């Protein structure tokens, strides 16, 4: 059995499938871990040796829907309850 070009033609099994957390095709079926985000680990996989990868998926690259709302409420002092009546 050769170990070069001829044996590469025999590779047809999928080792990775789509990850349910990050959506990338990096979830290893046998290991049951994602090589991209580290799922099922609670913490997201990130390393300092890949600064560019950290930049791609850090806070601010998405819609930031929740953080935008929190920031707006912070500026108003987290007001809650019914609005105060306007004095004439």
Swiss-Prot record:
InterPro entries: Ribosomal_eL37, Ribosomal_eL37/eL43, Ribosomal_eL37_CS, Ribosomal_zn-bd. A zinc finger (C4-type) spans 19-37. Keywords: Metal-binding, Ribonucleoprotein, Ribosomal protein, RNA-binding, rRNA-binding, Zinc, Zinc-finger. It holds the Pfam family Ribosomal_L37e. The keyword Repeat does not apply. GO terms for biological process: translation. It comes from the Eukaryota. This is Large ribosomal subunit protein eL37. It comes from Schistosoma mansoni.
């Amino acid at each position: 059995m050769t170990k070069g070009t001829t044996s590469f033609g025999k590779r047809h099994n999928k080792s990775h499938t789509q990850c349910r957390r990050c959506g990338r095709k990096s979830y290893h079926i046998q290991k049951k871990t994602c090589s991209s985000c580290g799922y099922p680990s609670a913490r997201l996989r990130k390393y300092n040796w890949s600064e560019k990868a950290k930049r791609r998926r850090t806070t601010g690259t998405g819609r930031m829907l929740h953080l935008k709302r929190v920031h707006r409420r912070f500026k108003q002092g987290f007001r809650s309850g019914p609005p105060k009546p306007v004095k004439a």
